[in-house]
Amino acid sequence: MGIKFTKMHGLGNDFIVLDGVNQSIQLTVEQIQKLANRHTGIGFDQCLLIESSQTEGIDFNYRIFNADGQEVGQCGNGARCIALFARYYGLTAKNKLTVATKTTLMDLIINEDNSVSVNMGVPRLAPGEIPLLADRQSPEYSLKLNNGNTVNLHAISVGNPHAVLLVENIDTAPVNSLGQQISFHPQFPEQVNVGFMQIVNHEKINLRVYERGCGETIACGSGAVAAAAIARLFYNLSDKITVHLPGGDLCIQWPCPTAPIILTGPAAFVYEGTLLS
């Protein structure tokens, strides 16, 4: 295959990043699945592909593939990696970039400390925009599970779909079992990422996330944004929230519901390599 890649991570949410500007890259679903295997491949949560854009005002196309090969529209941790990747490898000299994903535009700012701030846009709550099959918009929805039990959750889109559940203790939350049931629930026709949120105080939440196509990851940028938005809208938290994930902390700023929500956090390089087959 002979494709150069870079392994990166954002708080342990790990990626391979591919330069589609200087290389011709066409990966199949099966190839991505094989590369994502942590025993026989490289191992990663997502595969990120940066490509040239022909659209004025957009610096790059930013494509995101989950470990199951599915292309998705949002990844906040990956966006921070893409920004540092583009500058490090000389694809741009700019510290402020605009990238286009499958579903949205994102503004990325590389800060002086090499953290990256990501404009994640304005969160959307309308069921049709999430998407969620529901008769009307509601602060909370009830889903009936296969075992007959009912679970209450919030639903929101931040460029990709998220369900958020309030729990007393994330350490004992059934993230994998319940997360999987909700992620594949037929009321979410494009599947859904599932966040389990514990409110610590007015300015901090703890969070674990089951990501569609991946399972639980130790950090999820868009999940942090979704949970912080729900916390601010329905639980009266501050306009600046620290989200503590198993992999570390992210800062979310959201001055008001009509403004874009901003995610700030680190990104790190791990190693370079070449895909041989």
Swiss-Prot record:
Keywords (alphabetical) are:
Amino-acid biosynthesis, Cytoplasm, Isomerase, Lysine biosynthesis
Give the catalytic activity: (2S,6S)-2,6-diaminopimelate = meso-2,6-diaminopimelate
Q: Per the record, where is site Could be important to modulate the pK values of the two catalytic cysteine residues?
A: H162, E211
Query: Chief subcellular site?
Result: cytoplasm
Q: Name one Pfam family in it.
A: DAP_epimerase
Q: Which Gene3D superfamilies match?
A: Diaminopimelate Epimerase, Chain A, domain 1
Q: Name one GO molecular function term.
A: diaminopimelate epimerase activity
Please indicate if the UniProt record lists Isomerase as a keyword: yes
- Active site residues of this protein: C75 (proton donor), C220 (proton acceptor)
NCBIfam families named in the record: DapF (TIGR00652)
Q: What is this protein called?
A: Diaminopimelate epimerase
